Amino acid sequence: MNVGILGIGRYVPEKVVTNHDLEKIMDTSDEWIRTRTGIAERRIADDTIDTSYMAVEASKKALEDAGISGEDIDLILVATVTPDRAFPAVACVIQEAIGAKHAAAMDLSAACAGFMYGMITAQQFIQTGTYKNVLVVGSDKLSKIVDWNDRNTAVLFGDGAGAIVMGAVSEGKGVLSFELGADGSGGKHLYQDEYVMMNGREVFKFAVRQLGDSCLRVLDKAGLTKEDVDFLVPHQANIRIMESARERLNLPQEKMSMTIEKFGNTSASSIPIAMVEELQNGRIQDGDLIILVGFGGGLTWGAVALRWGK
């Protein structure tokens, strides 16, 4: 059975916070942020919008895009590091909101790589015949766990949610290969106590090495080469990290998603948010070979070779 994406949706808050806005509250500048990260602005949720609200809104759009109802969903998986509370899970909030009365529901935590973990967990459940339709959501309100006095982290993050419905697709479409990985010895480089703490140099070295390597490995598993790749959707963390992955695949700039300028790093939601952007712009077409790749705290990573279409 081939498993792929039947529908996709996203939600981003309306409030835009630019680099110039941040100049007013911390020792930074638009030039400093842009040259180091590629970010110009980010969306920030106000106090009335929480992780589950964003997740529900993205889920509704994904269901509409898939042409199914909540009752057709068998499992809900939510990747998040900023749940509204320890329990109930964000997935359970979604279950009630969309009327998915037949669905099991749980959250999972793999930081910014969480969406990749959720996507492959869903694919495995469907491929084994356990479930037919699985809703996978990445949703994070990182603005509530960053120290707004720390310019090294506060400038990076934005809020948002992205969702996909996964199910059976036609032969040759969907997930062709994948890789999930973790290196717990690097957990000390990116973690949260009260606020997000990051050793930027070590995370950068890890990400540059791992993103390119994992892209090449999933291509090899699928019996494909980098010449076969039509489009790259990396986790939107840092422009220099993303460029390193693109260069490893020998792709021109127009074949890589670059939404970080508008949305910043939205953690588990960054890949589906970027995919919606590229679909709307017509840069992802039916039959395209797409590489999705992400990394996050843990340290964790994941990559998927995906043939777009149903």
Curated annotation (Swiss-Prot):
UniProt keyword Lipid metabolism, yes or no: yes
EC number(s) given by UniProt: 2.3.1.180
Coarse class of the protein's main subcellular location: cytoplasm
Keywords: Acyltransferase, Cytoplasm, Fatty acid biosynthesis, Fatty acid metabolism, Lipid biosynthesis, Lipid metabolism, Multifunctional enzyme, Transferase
Annotated stretches, region: ACP-binding: 236-240
Pathway entry: Lipid metabolism; fatty acid biosynthesis
Cross-referenced InterPro entries: ACP_syn_III_C, ACP_syn_III_N, FabH, Thiolase-like
GO biological process: fatty acid biosynthetic process
Compartments, as annotated in UniProt: Cytoplasm
A Pfam family reported for this protein in Swiss-Prot or TrEMBL: ACP_syn_III
Gene Ontology cellular-component terms listed: cytoplasm
Catalytic activity: malonyl-[ACP] + acetyl-CoA + H(+) = 3-oxobutanoyl-[ACP] + CO2 + CoA
GO molecular function annotation: 3-oxoacyl-[acyl-carrier-protein] synthase activity; beta-ketoacyl-acyl-carrier-protein synthase III activity
Active-site residue list: C112, H235, N265
Source organism, top-level taxon: Bacteria
Subunit structure: Homodimer.
UniProt domain comment: The last Arg residue of the ACP-binding site is essential for the weak association between ACP/AcpP and FabH.
Family according to the record: Belongs to the thiolase-like superfamily. FabH family.
HAMAP family per record: FabH
Job description of the protein: Catalyzes the condensation reaction of fatty acid synthesis by the addition to an acyl acceptor of two carbons from malonyl-ACP. Catalyzes the first condensation reaction which initiates fatty acid synthesis and may therefore play a role in governing the total rate of fatty acid production. Possesses both acetoacetyl-ACP synthase and acetyl transacylase activities. Its substrate specificity determines the biosynthesis of branched-chain and/or straight-chain of fatty acids.
Protein name stated in the entry: Beta-ketoacyl-[acyl-carrier-protein] synthase III 1
Organism from which the protein derives: Bacillus anthracis
Species classification: Bacteria, Bacillati, Bacillota, Bacilli, Bacillales
Recorded name of the encoding gene: fabH1
